[in-house]
Amino acid sequence: MSRLGVLLTICLLLFPLTAVPLDGDQPADRPAERLQDDISSEHHPHFDSGRECCGSFACRFGCVPCCV
């Protein structure tokens, strides 16, 4: 059991948990900043303002919400 503890200690020293990126750093988790960056679907070139959605072709390229 002490070998496992030594191995765990060595692994934590070589690869600390602070080196792992947090999920909060992802832009998808920050919708307010996404809207400020002007990357919302309403500004997508394939957004249909009449139907207020994107065509099925544009959905493959990141335009949401998709028309079904």
Curated annotation (Swiss-Prot):
Propeptide: 20-51
GO molecular function: ion channel inhibitor activity; toxin activity
Modified residues (4-hydroxyproline): 65
Chain spans, region Disordered: 22-46
Pfam families membership: Conotoxin (PF02950)
Signal peptide region: 1-19
Tissue specificity comment: Expressed by the venom duct.
Sequence ranges of Basic and acidic residues compositional bias: 27-46
Keyword Secreted: yes
Keywords (A to Z) from UniProt: Disulfide bond, Hydroxylation, Secreted, Signal, Toxin
GO cellular component: extracellular region
Localisation per UniProt entry: Secreted
Disulfide bridges in this chain: 53-67, 54-63, 59-66
The organism's place on the tree of life at top rank: Eukaryota
Chief subcellular location: secreted
Family: Belongs to the conotoxin M superfamily.
Entry remark concerning the domains of this protein: The cysteine framework is III (CC-C-C-CC).
Entry protein name: Conotoxin Mr3.3
